[in-house]
Curated annotation (Swiss-Prot):
GO terms for biological process: ribosomal small subunit biogenesis; translation. HAMAP family: Ribosomal_uS4_B. InterPro entries: Ribosomal_uS4, Ribosomal_uS4_bac-type, Ribosomal_uS4_CS, Ribosomal_uS4_N, S4_RNA-bd, S4_RNA-bd_sf. The keyword RNA-binding applies. Keywords: Ribonucleoprotein, Ribosomal protein, RNA-binding, rRNA-binding. One of its GO terms (molecular function) is structural constituent of ribosome. SMART domains: Ribosomal_S4 (SM01390), S4 (SM00363). It comes from the Bacteria. GO terms for cellular component: small ribosomal subunit. PROSITE patterns: RIBOSOMAL_S4 (PS00632), S4 (PS50889). It comes from Nitrobacter winogradskyi (strain ATCC 25391 / DSM 10237 / CIP 104748 / NCIMB 11846 / Nb-255). This is Small ribosomal subunit protein uS4.
């Protein structure tokens, strides 16, 4: 198993936080990392360690994005006008896999990536199988007709653990969603605190 495909709950345990707010997370029962040394008391992190942890947590949240891809997103964020940390969040939220997850078409961000790869999703009426595809404001995302009644989709629609954020207009009767606006950090329903400014500091060293 590659690091990118690391089990989602292992990420929770490594971070010591339930980063997606899921009821089955092992962190709900124990707050230590994976492995035989997971229960050792951790010392105070250095500034570098705190910044690195913030980066690992955000990368993990968005499906364990590869370092190369994540850094490319960061570079794009720094070239945009405005706050680089806010821009970073906005770019991550514009990813197709993120919107499919936010719209509650699938239960997890990992499932969103697989769902898209398998050709179940259309953008503005055309099939797109690239999870990192960057949406624009006004784009419509929908589950293709043959996939709308899949158990995975119907069960995800009913998940009580999270709501569809207000920057996405989702219609579960049609299994479609419209990307209304690019959110800021405060708009994104993270289950734990995310600190993109620390990631900017990390890469700016």
């Amino acid at each position: 198993m590659t690091k990118r495909n690391e089990a989602k709950y292992k990420i929770d345990r490594r971070m010591g936080q339930n980063i997606w707010g899921r009821p089955k997370s092992p962190v709900n029962k124990r707050e230590y990392g994976p492995g035989q040394h997971g229960q050792r008391r951790k010392g105070k992190l250095s500034d570098f360690g705190t910044q690195l942890r913030a980066k690992q947590k955000l990368k993990g949240y968005y499906g364990n994005i590869s370092e190369r891809q994540f850094y490319a997103i960061y570079v794009e964020a720094t070239r945009m006008k405005g706050d680089s940390g806010e821009n970073l969040i906005g770019l991550l939220e514009r990813r197709l896999d993120t919107v499919v997850y936010r719209a509650k078409f699938v239960p997890t961000i990992f499932a969103a990536r697989q769902f898209i790869n398998h050709g179940h999703v259309k953008v503005n009426g055309r099939r797109v199988n690239i999870p990192s595809y960057k949406l624009k404001v006004g784009d419509t995302v929908e589950v293709k007709d043959a996939s709308k009644q899949l158990a995975l989709v119907l069960e995800a629609n009913q998940l009580a653990e999270r709501d569809v954020p207000d920057f996405i207009d989702a219609d579960h009767n049609k299994q479609s969603a419209k990307f209304i606006r690019i959110p800021q950090l405060a708009d994104v329903p993270f289950a734990v605190q995310m600190e993109p400014h620390l990631i900017v500091e990390f890469y700016s060293r």
